[in-house]
Amino acid sequence: MSRPRIGFLLPHYPRRSTSHMPLVMRALADAGAIVDLVHPTGRTVDLSQVRVEHDLYVLRKMSGLALSLAGALHELGAAIINSYPATATLRDKIVSFRILQAAGVPTPATFAASHPDELLPQLADGPLVVKPYQGGGGHGIRVVRTAAELAAVPYDRHKPLFAQRYHAPDGRDRKIYVIGGRVFGVKKVFPRRTDADKHGEPFTPAPELREIAVRCGCAFDVDLYGVDIVESGGQPYVVDVGSIPGFKGVADAVQLLARHLYAAAERAARGEGALSEVLS
């Protein structure tokens, strides 16, 4: 069988980045795959020359040119992990949380608004967590308890506001990572300031948390993802689902990801679809 070709659409990583992805690319090449960096390349893209040239594309970047290129490749029939539609959906918390609710995933009460003032009545029932409706990584998250704090929330009239009921955590947040149906748990603090905070403490997820994580993956038909869970009063609440996160704290993450992507590329080359059988 010919060597699988895998193209990566990635963020711009700084030289001292601790991301696993450059190491995953190296591991795939060592395993015999032909690995190319499709984005970033530092040059203009001639859209007429965009065509499917790889058995599999790995979409790690959730915005900008990389996401748009993934959309173009998707329309041309490319196999992408995670798929362009799923990645675009997960980028929008308003859309993704309605999907999670419909799938029976436990989430905090969730609200969308056009202006901070519209959220004021919700404070009567307790604090809110206000966060950007797009993006991730814990950026721009605020716990709002008063009208004054709500008025201080940065506001762009061209973008909606996204808010959830705040539930005080029983302890550290539970980060559940899934690699092709394999479930890994890491306890993490928020906000994460040090490398130790980012790697957290591995733990074995209880069956309830495993089931929640798998249900999240099935809701979006994704193979590589992370689920943020806050446990409050013994009740788990999903507060975020991310496409292809950093997998920090997962033992042997580089090799696990490389093996999964290599197998997915082989399946895609045979026309069988890139997703693992666990979620197909």
Positions of the model-derived regions?
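Phosphate-binding site of ATP-dependent enzymes
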Residues: 139-220
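Conserved N-proximal alpha/beta basic substrate-recognition cap immediately N-terminal to
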Residues: 5-109
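Short glycine-rich anion-binding loops that position phosphate/pyrophosphate groups of nucleotides
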Residues: 62-64, 134-135, 244
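Protein kinase-like catalytic core scaffold
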Residues: 128, 162, 184-185, 225, ...
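Short beta->alpha connector loops
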Residues: 40-43, 61-65, 113-117, 167-169, ...
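A short beta-strand motif that forms the metal-chelation/ATP-contact edge
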Residues: 54-58, 176-178, 235-247
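Rossmann-like NAD(P)H-binding beta-loop-alpha module
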Residues: 108-128
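A long amphipathic alpha-helix within ATP-dependent nucleotide-binding catalytic cores
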Residues: 193-238, 242, 250-279
